[in-house]
UniProtKB/Swiss-Prot annotation:
This is Beta-2-microglobulin. One of its GO terms (biological process) is antigen processing and presentation of peptide antigen via MHC class I. It comes from the Eukaryota. It is found in: Secreted. Its main location: secreted.
Length: 118
């Protein structure tokens, strides 16, 4: 009986080790359609490959948080997570847009600027 209990405990400990693999997020910022000044569009921030799942993602306009929607948290085959944050916006020649990500694997928030040409 004792060897069985030890084996079960060892198995549980090895499973708990899955949570210990911390992975930093990859961040991509892009618009749904090619950018045209004055034409409504959608701004997307796709964050992937991160673990653990606790994360904070904000879309920013000139450094200020925008109202945005977030997809449900999903995971890949490798058990890393991904999310999409998106909002409607109308690009112009002046405003700057970016995505700010806060995650336990990052020393400071990661900010990725939207490049309207890509």
């Amino acid at each position: 009986m004792a060897p069985l209990v030890a084996l079960v405990l060892l198995g549980l400990l090895s499973l708990s080790g899955l949570d210990a693999v911390a992975r930093p997020p990859k961040v991509q910022v892009y618009s749904r359609h090619p950018a045209e000044n004055g034409k409504p569009n959608y701004l997307n921030c796709y964050v992937s490959g991160f673990h653990p799942p606790q994360i904070e993602i904000d879309l920013l306009k000139n450094g200020e948080k925008m109202n945005a929607e977030q997809s449900d948290l999903s995971f890949s085959k490798d058990w890393s997570f991904y999310l999409l944050v998106h909002t409607e916006f109308t690009p112009n020649a002046v405003d700057q847009y970016s995505c700010r990500v806060k995650h336990v694997t990052l020393d400071k928030p990661k900010i990725v600027k939207w490049d309207r040409d890509h």
